[in-house]
């Protein structure tokens, strides 16, 4: 299993005090089905004591990409256009 973060995600995770250990643990939980599967290789996972949400893209079953992070208090969910964009990225 390989876990990657975009530059933007890494900066946001650091500012929200989310550790790499927590991110790796979240991937293991995602593999166990403890995340919301949004289709097309896109997953939504709760992080940091349920305060933040991460969008994770899965590629080939062993590569995972953290791409987007948002606080639940700032944004209730991603919209359908954003979801379509994440699905398109997950294809490539």
Which residues are covered by each model-predicted region?
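Mixed-charge (Asp/Glu-Lys/Arg
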Residues: 20, 24-25, 32, 85-91
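A short, surface-exposed loop/turn module that caps and links secondary-structure elements
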Residues: 24-51
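Sequence-level motif detector for i,i+2 pairs with an aromatic at +2
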Residues: 1, 40, 61-62
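Amphipathic alpha-helical protein-protein interaction segments
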Residues: 51-52, 63
């Amino acid at each position: 299993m390989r876990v990657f973060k975009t530059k933007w995600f890494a900066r946001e995770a650091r500012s929200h005090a989310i550790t790499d250990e927590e991110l790796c643990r979240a991937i293991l939980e995602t593999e166990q089905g403890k995340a919301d599967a949004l289709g097309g290789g896109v997953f939504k996972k709760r992080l940091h004591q349920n305060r933040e949400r991460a969008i994770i893209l899965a590629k080939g079953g062993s590569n995972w990409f953290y791409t987007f992070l948002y606080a639940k208090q700032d944004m209730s969910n991603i919209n359908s256009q954003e979801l379509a964009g994440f699905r398109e990225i997950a294809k490539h």
